[in-house]
C-alpha cells in the first residue's frame, strides 16, 4: 500500500469507474436545486435524488461523482475530536436501474485491493443479517477470506428513511492495528474504539417500503455508494486524524504560522487550530457556490462558521483579519478538482474579509453586553441567560446563538433556548406567512410528479406566440381531474405551447386559452422539478376537458416588454465588465414586463461616474442596432467560444447561446429581441447593496424608461415652481435655502442651550446624596441631545464628585443622558446600567460606559417616573 495524496485518491476513484462505463459528473453545488428538504447538500447521493425517484432522467444509467458536502449537526465536536468536520468530499458510484450487487461488489474489492493496494489482511466486510445474496457474491466473486465477513443488524447494515426506496448495505472496513478479529462482538468493540474504521458503504436499493411497512421489491433496483475521501486519505497516508491529511494539514500549518503556534503542544490551542482549519474549508467552498453571509438559511450557516473561526483566531491571539489569507491554501490544494475556486479566488477572499471586518465591528460591543448580562446573573445568583437577551445579541450584534452558548459554557451558564426560539419565531412570523403565499405549488407538486416522465410539452415560444395544442393533464387542488368548469382555477399541461415558463430569472408568460365556447385566462406559466410546463389557469367562460384541442395565445405586448428587459440585462452585464471590471459576474437576475433587476459581485457601491458610463455604453449598443443571434451547441463548445455561464448552474449537454453581435455572448434559455434597437432606451433607476459583496442594479427599458424620464422632468418642474427659479438655477437656489435653514436651526439650538444653562441653578437645588455619592437629576422640555449633554457635562463639573442623570421630553419622545465622575464610578456608579434601566421605564433602550451613557424612549409621559427611579438604581449598585 503506497502513500497517496487526497487529490490522487479522488482521481484514481473517478478514473476507475469511468473505466467501468460510468459518466463522470462534476460535483453539484452545495446549494440544493429544487429540494426544500435540504439546506445544504450533505451526502453524495443528495443531488441525485430526482434520478433515483424517477422524477428526472439521468444523463446516463451509470454515474460517478466526487460531491462536496456540508454537515453542521456535530459542529460542537469539530476541533475536539480528530475526525469531526463540517466539510467533506464524498466519492460515489451510482446505478439507476442498471447494474446491481453482482457488479458493484467485485468492482469495490478490485478498486480497494488492486487500485489502492490495501492489504487484504487489513480489510473486513459487513453485510445485512439476512442478505445471503451479498454473502454469496462476496465469497464467490472476490477472494476475500469468508471469516472476515460479519453479518450485522438493521441499525448497521440496512438503509431506510421512512417510507420509500430502501435496502440492505454492505460496508468495507479497515483495521488500523491489532490481531485478526474472529467474532462479531470483537468487531463491534474494535469499531467503537476506532481501531477498525468503515470507509465505503455500498447501498443496495432493492425495496420500496409502503405505509404498512411492507418491503416490496423494486422492478429496477439501484446502487448508491459512498466513500468519505478524507477518511480514505487517513488510511492511505497512515495518519489517525483528518487534520493530518496532506491537503488539510497544509491549511492547519498556515494558521499555525500566522498564530506563531506549534500544533500538538497545547490541547486548547490545538482545538482552535482544528476549528479554524475545518471552518475555513467550508466557507471557501460555500462562497464559491454563491452563498453569502446573512441572518437566515444557508447564509446563516456560513456566517456562523466564519464568526466561530474568527473567534477561535482571537483565542489564539491572532490580531486583525486573517481568514481571507488562509483560504488561498484551500484553493491552492483543491482548484484542480474544483475549477470554480481559482476562478472565484479574489471574490472569495473579499467576501471573507468583509465578513471578518463586520464581525470585528460588532464582537467587542456584543461581548461587552454579554459580560454585563453575565455580571447581572452572577449578582442575582442565577445560571440561565433569558431568551430575549440571547436574541438581542443575535439580532442586534450578529452573534450566532451557538457562539453565545460557547462563551457562556466557558462560564458555566446556560441559555433559555425556549425563550430564544419564541423571540425568533415572532420575528419570522410575517416572513413565513409571505413564503406560504408564494408557495404556488403546495401538495400539487406531488401529484404532478406521479405523472409519466414522458408526458412533456414541446416549447414553441421562440418563434410562435399562438399555437393549437391538446390538453394532456388537468390538476385541480390536490387531484388529477378530467374537467375544469367556469369559475374554477387549476393547472393544465398541454402537448405544445408558446408560453415561456418562469426560469433563468425571466418571469413566465400570461395570455389566453380559447376553444369552442370557452375562454380561459392563463395567469402564469412555470416549471416543476421534473421539467413539466405548468399553465395556471382560471376558467372565465365554458369548460375545458382532457384531450380538448385548444388555442393558446401569449400576451404579445407583455412578452415584448419582457424581451426588451432580458436583452438589456445581457448588455448591462457586459457593460459592467467593461466599465467596472472583468471580475464582475452575475449573482442573480429577474426580468418582468416592468423592469429588470441584475445582481452582481462587487465590493463597493458604484460611483456616479461608473453608473453614468455603464448606462451610456448600454444605450450606445442599443443605438447600434446590433443583431441578436441564438445557437444551440454542446456545452464545452459554448464555453470555448467565450459564452458566459453562471458559475453555480448545472447545464445540459446541449445549451442555447444568445449573442448580441460581438459585444455579448451568454448561455441563456430566455426570450430576446431580434436586434438591440428594439430595446429603445435603457435607464438605471437604482444601485444598491443586497448582501456582503453583492450589488444590485434595477433598470427600465423602452416606454417604461421614457415614462421614468418624464416623471423625473415633472418632479424637476415642480421643484422649480416651489423654489421660484429656472432649471439651471435649481441647485444654487436649493443650496442657499438649505444653508439658510441650517443657520436658523443653529440660532434655535443656541437659544435652547442658553435656556438649558439657565436651568442649572433650579436643578442643583434638588441635589441628593446616595451612599456618599452626590446625585443630580431632573426633567427638562424641548432640549435637543447636544444641549442636554452639554448641560450634564457642566453640572458634573459643578458637583465635582457625583452622578448627573437628565431627561428631555418633546415631540412625542424622550432623551436621557447620564454622566459620572471618576470618584462616583470607583464607588460603584455605572451610567450604562443606570440609563438602560431608566430608559426601559419610558419604553426605550440604550446604554454606554460607566462614566457616560445616553438613551431614548417612546413614552415621554413616563419621564418623571423614570428619573425618580435613579436613586434606587444607584443605591443598588453602590456597595
Curated annotation (Swiss-Prot):
Entry note: cofactor: Binds 1 zinc ion per subunit.
Molecular function via GO: alanine-tRNA ligase activity; aminoacyl-tRNA deacylase activity; ATP binding; catalytic activity, acting on a protein; transferase activity; tRNA binding; zinc ion binding
GO cellular component, one term: cytosol
Catalysed reactions, as listed in the record: tRNA(Ala) + L-alanine + ATP = L-alanyl-tRNA(Ala) + AMP + diphosphate
Superkingdom of source: Bacteria
Compartmental location: Cytoplasm
Keyword Protein biosynthesis: yes
InterPro entries named in the record: aa-tRNA-synth_II/BPL/LPL, Ala-tRNA-lgiase_IIc, Ala-tRNA-ligase_IIc_anticod-bd, Ala-tRNA-synth_IIc_core, Ala-tRNA-synth_IIc_N, Ala-tRNA_ligase, Ala_tRNA_ligase_euk/bac, DHHA1_dom
UniProt keyword terms in alphabetical order: Aminoacyl-tRNA synthetase, ATP-binding, Cytoplasm, Ligase, Metal-binding, Nucleotide-binding, Protein biosynthesis, RNA-binding, tRNA-binding, Zinc
GO biological process entries: alanyl-tRNA aminoacylation
Pfam families in alphabetical order: DHHA1 (PF02272), tRNA-synt_2c (PF01411), tRNA_SAD (PF07973)
Enzyme Commission numbers on file: 6.1.1.7
Similarity field: Belongs to the class-II aminoacyl-tRNA synthetase family.
Domain remark from Swiss-Prot or TrEMBL: Consists of three domains; the N-terminal catalytic domain, the editing domain and the C-terminal C-Ala domain. The editing domain removes incorrectly charged amino acids, while the C-Ala domain, along with tRNA(Ala), serves as a bridge to cooperatively bring together the editing and aminoacylation centers thus stimulating deacylation of misacylated tRNAs.
Name this polypeptide is given: Alanine--tRNA ligase
The organism of origin for this protein: Clostridium tetani (strain Massachusetts / E88)
UniProt lineage: Bacteria, Bacillati, Bacillota, Clostridia, Eubacteriales
Gene: alaS
